[in-house]
């Protein structure tokens, strides 16, 4: 969705086709050995970026909002009630609706076998994957607050193990700036 096939999704959004599109965002091409995509976050190591990705993650939800679609939202299984509510809301609407669900990839992210839900929760609570919704491309609502430093999220993943303190701080500043932007848009 982020790269391959994006032009079709963008065209459907521009026409406001009656589609409920759900993107499972695992932040890379995980079916080909954990290669980078435009969904891969800044500094994350992948098979094709062993030194870490040097560009930020594409804001797909924001791009859909820029098309003026009736509904675009992010969600996480770590916040199941929020996810269910958004799915029900999207199903009740007409036009193109898009939900982006964060789906941690255990081997691709280098997580312990039992850490998928923990990673999803920390991604949301650190602001690395903000959970929010946008109606009609304009009305932003943040659904889960940012309550933790990103370092807590990074330390459980092998793809970030090579980061030094300066890179972690730079990533925190990037996340804080993105969060501040969302808060401005929510007003």
Which residues fall in each region the model found?
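Generic secondary-structure signature for well-ordered alpha-helical cores
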Residues: 14-17, 27-28, 34, 65-70, ...
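Thiamine diphosphate
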Residues: 1-31, 71, 78-85
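Flexible, low-complexity linker and terminal segments
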Residues: 104-187
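Short, solvent-exposed amphipathic alpha-helical segments in soluble enzyme
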Residues: 9-13, 37-39, 88-92, 114-119, ...
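Conserved thiamine diphosphate
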Residues: 37-93
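Short acidic, glycine/serine/threonine-rich loops at helix termini
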Residues: 4-8, 31-36, 109-114
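Generic secondary-structure microfeatures
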Residues: 76, 102-105
